């Protein structure tokens, strides 16, 4: 148990202080100084307890006490210190030497507490809105995850129906539903790479056959031109007796062209599927072309014939002019 209050003693006066009591207390403290509050009632003859004398001096009678309204700076200090220290008014008053702890306590209970409540009530709608938005965002995250799970479930069911179920449907379902997936592209590329060598071989074979066909067509056209030229100039050979190529030479040329045509037809008809045989046939064809006579003789003969024809035309036209 604590010590009983001194004011409960018999003959101790309670209530407000009178001006006479204030004058006696102030005069005593000016002579002896503030301290040893237990001896003050007995030395001054005041019917007050020591605690009442101390509080009367510190809260009302001591010099330097500031009265009046609190400044905004003092209000901020009181609010900050009250949040840190709580309701320890004496400790708060030590940071405000011109204000007493009693004045600070009274001002807190009558003014500052109400201001803080109003400020909190004004901020409560914003805080409530922030809390609702946070809850809404939290609720938004849940359906998204649920939607993602539903999507994965649908993907897995789709794979099971198609016979492509796997142990991880969440990882494989987007790949299965995607149209141009990497697997399909790789399969297409594999098929293309497998068929590409054959296609290239066929293209090379077609190009070689086209080149040979073009050579045959040029040879045939040249042979036809030679035949027509022989037929045209054969009467002139009989009449005029000009210097033309003999029939034996034309027959040899035509036989060479026919042999060349027959050789190309046989090579085109008997093209092997194997690349080694094809290369061997090409080599044999190349060697045979080396042994055959060149076409420069035919070209030279055609050029000579065209020149002779031009001279005859000029001779025929000269008597006209």
UniProtKB/Swiss-Prot annotation:
Q: Where is the composition biased (Basic and acidic residues)?
A: 273-290
Q: Which SUPFAM superfamilies match?
A: Homeodomain-like
Name what induces it: Repressed by abscisic acid (ABA) and osmotic stress (salt stress).
Biased composition (Polar residues) is annotated at 206-215
Q: Record's Gene Ontology CC terms?
A: nucleus
GO terms for biological process, alphabetical: response to abscisic acid; response to auxin; response to salt stress; stomatal movement
Q: Which residues bind DNA?
A: 37-61, 89-112
Keywords from UniProt, A to Z, are:
DNA-binding, Nucleus, Repeat, S-nitrosylation, Transcription, Transcription regulation
Protein function: Transcription factor involved in the regulation of gene (e.g. drought-regulated and flavonoid biosynthetic genes) expression and stomatal movements leading to negative regulation of responses to drought and responses to other physiological stimuli (e.g. light).
This chain's protein is named Transcription factor MYB60
The scientific name of the source species is Vitis vinifera (Grape)
- What is the taxonomic lineage of the source species? Eukaryota, Viridiplantae, Streptophyta, Embryophyta, Tracheophyta
């Amino acid at each position: 148990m604590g010590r009983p209050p001194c004011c409960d003693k018999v003959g101790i006066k309670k209530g407000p202080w009178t001006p006479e009591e204030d004058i006696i207390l102030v005069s005593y403290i000016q002579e002896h100084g503030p301290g040893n509050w237990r001896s003050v009632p007995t030395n001054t003859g005041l019917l007050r307890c020591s605690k009442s004398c101390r509080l009367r001096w510190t809260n009302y009678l001591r010099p330097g006490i500031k009265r009046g309204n609190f400044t905004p700076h003092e209000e901020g200090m009181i609010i900050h210190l009250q949040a840190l220290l709580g309701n320890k008014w004496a400790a708060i008053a030590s940071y405000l030497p011109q204000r007493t702890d009693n004045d600070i306590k009274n001002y807190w209970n009558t003014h500052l507490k109400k201001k803080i409540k109003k400020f909190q009530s004004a901020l409560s709608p914003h805080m409530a809105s922030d809390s609702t938005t946070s809850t809404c965002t939290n609720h938004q995250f849940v359906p998204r995850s649920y939607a993602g799970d539903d999507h994965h479930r649908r993907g897995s069911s789709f794979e099971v129906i198609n016979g492509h179920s796997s142990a991880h449907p969440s990882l494989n379902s987007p790949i299965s539903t995607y149209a141009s997936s990497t697997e399909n592209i790789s399969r297409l590329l594999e098929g293309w790479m497998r068929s590409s060598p054959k296609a290239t071989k066929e293209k090379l074979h077609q190009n070689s056959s086209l080149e040979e066909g073009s050579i045959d067509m040029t040879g045939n056209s040249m042979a036809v031109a030679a035949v027509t030229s022989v037929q045209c100039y054969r009467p002139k050979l009989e009449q005029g007796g000009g210097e033309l190529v003999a029939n034996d030479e034309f027959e040899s040329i035509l036989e060479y062209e026919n042999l060349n045509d027959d050789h190309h037809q046989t090579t085109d008809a008997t093209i092997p599927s194997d690349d080694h045989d094809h290369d061997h046939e090409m080599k044999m064809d190349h060697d045979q072309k080396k042994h055959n006579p060149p076409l420069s003789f035919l070209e030279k003969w055609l050029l000579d014939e065209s020149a002779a024809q031009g001279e005859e035309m000029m001779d025929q036209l000269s008597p006209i002019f």
